[in-house]
């Protein structure tokens, strides 16, 4: 299995509910790198990169989000891998 990298955008009740914090924790558990950033329109952008199986598990998790959130829409597309290591939030 190779590495995959996607940029994901989620909408709904995803800001002010710990979404980025829980996303970072889950990504680190899965050995992924990337970021989770709040956007001005109320959505969250997530860049995830890592082993294919871990990335696919993360995509499934992002569709639901943490219990504190309510994801109403999610879109993703292939993206260049992030420079550097770790998982960052703004």
From Swiss-Prot:
SUPFAM superfamilies: Acylphosphatase/BLUF domain-like
EC number from the UniProt entry: 3.6.1.7
Entry annotation: catalytic residues: 20, 38
Enzyme class: hydrolase
Catalytic activity: an acyl phosphate + H2O = a carboxylate + phosphate + H(+)
Signal peptide extent: none
Keyword Hydrolase annotated: yes
Listed InterPro entries: Acylphosphatase, Acylphosphatase-like_dom, Acylphosphatase-like_dom_sf, Acylphosphatase_CS
Domain of life where this protein originates: Bacteria
Gene Ontology MF terms: acylphosphatase activity
UniProt domain Acylphosphatase-like: residue ranges: 5-90
Residue spans crossing the bilayer: none
One Pfam family recorded for the sequence: Acylphosphatase
Sorted UniProt keywords: Hydrolase
The keyword Hydrolase is annotated on this UniProt entry: yes
Family note: Belongs to the acylphosphatase family.
Protein name: Acylphosphatase
């Amino acid at each position: 299995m190779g590495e995959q990298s996607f940029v994901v955008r989620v909408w709904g009740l995803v800001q002010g509910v710990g979404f980025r914090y829980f996303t970072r924790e889950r990504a680190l558990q899965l050995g992924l790198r990337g970021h989770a950033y709040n956007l001005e329109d109320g959505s969250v952008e997530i860049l995830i990169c890592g082993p294919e199986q871990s990335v696919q598990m993360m995509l499934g998790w992002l569709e639901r989000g943490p219990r504190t959130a309510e994801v109403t829409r999610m879109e993703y597309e292939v993206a260049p891998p992030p420079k550097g290591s770790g998982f960052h939030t703004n």
